[in-house]
Design a protein with these regions (language model features):
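Acidic/histidine-rich catalytic neighborhood of metal-dependent amide-processing enzymes
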Residues: 35-106
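Flexible, glycine/proline-enriched loop segments at strand-loop-helix junctions
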Residues: 28-32, 63-68, 120-129
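Acidic/His- and Gly-rich active-site-bordering loop/insert found
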Residues: 1-29, 49-54
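Metal-dependent amide/peptide-bond hydrolase catalytic core
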Residues: 7, 96, 101-104, 110-253
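Residues at secondary-structure transition points
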Residues: 21, 32-35, 126, 221
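Short pre-catalytic strand/loop immediately N-terminal to key active-site residues, enriched for Gly-Thr
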Residues: 22-33, 235-240
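Glycine-rich, phosphate-binding/catalytic loops in enzymes
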Residues: 12-17, 44, 76-78, 109-111
Length: 253
């Protein structure tokens, strides 16, 4: 289970140190994601260690889940102590899911669509080439794009292709000579990473794409005996995981 880290989800979760305790209940930032998962594993470790079980269980706690991939604690563990994981038959990542099972996960990639122009004074704009204007066809492609819902092993994964940032320009009287649009693509686990890259290159044909994050999807894999027994114990229909999680790292082993 990922340990709570300071850098997780920058810009989406307000920073605060305020927390409240009410008996066994903790309220505060990170209480659900991921202190809740940590607490569940610690409780299970304490209780199941004192019992006879049919399974050999390994509990893994790691840092840096939601930051740069090269900092991932799970990736570091796989590199340095892969024997703890590579022999596993089944893995559960304790993301907050409202008590249901979410199988696999969508893949994600981030990239910049970059344009170049020619700087000029805006009073003599005809002497320049506006790099921001050159992004217009790329924005139009996004506005008309229809994301798919794709069934994979009985679960419906919703895809998404969205601009998340745009940057360009240096001053209010200068025609910009460079611009960039930051795009996020969430793709279903029916695609490999290479297939997803080929798709966005087709959507943005003619543009330079600068990829900054490439994370593969993971298929559900809920048809194994261990998975089906867990589904029966939970008693709820499994759902797809729309976001990306470290389940994808486990599925690559």
């Amino acid at each position: 289970v990922p340990l709570p880290t300071v850098e997780g989800s920058p810009g989406t979760v307000p920073s605060t140190v305020r927390e409240e305790e009410d008996g066994y209940v903790l309220y505060g930032r990170g209480a659900t994601d991921m202190k809740g998962g940590v607490a569940v594993q610690l409780k299970l470790a304490a209780e199941l260690t004192a019992q006879d079980t049919d399974y050999n269980l390994t509990y893994i706690f790691y840092d840096n889940e939601e930051v740069a991939s090269e900092l991932s604690g799970l990736a570091r563990l796989i590199r340095n102590h892969g024997e703890l994981i590579t022999d596993a038959d089944f893995g559960v990542l304790l993301e907050p899911t409202n008590g249901t099972i979410e199988g696999g996960c969508n893949g994600t990639m981030r990239f910049f669509v970059r344009t170049r122009g020619l700087a000029a004074h805006s009073g003599r704009a005809w002497r320049g080439e506006n790099a921001i204007h050159a992004l217009a066809p790329a924005l139009a492609a996004l506005a008309s794009y229809e994301p798919k819902t794709i069934a994979v092993e009985g679960l419906d994964y919703r895809e998404g292709l969205n601009a998340v940032q745009i940057s360009g320009g240096v001053a209010g009287n200068v025609i910009p000579d460079a611009a960039a649009m930051h795009v996020n693509y969430r793709f279903a686990p029916d695609k490999t990473l290479d297939e997803a890259i080929s798709h966005v290159r087709e959507v943005f044909a003619g543009y330079d794409l600068d990829f900054v994050d490439l994370s593969p999807a993971a298929r559900p894999g809920l048809d194994t005996p261990l998975a089906t027994s867990l589904i029966e114990a939970v008693g709820e229909e499994p759902q797809p995981k729309y976001g990306w999680t470290d389940v994808a790292r486990l599925s690559e082993i």
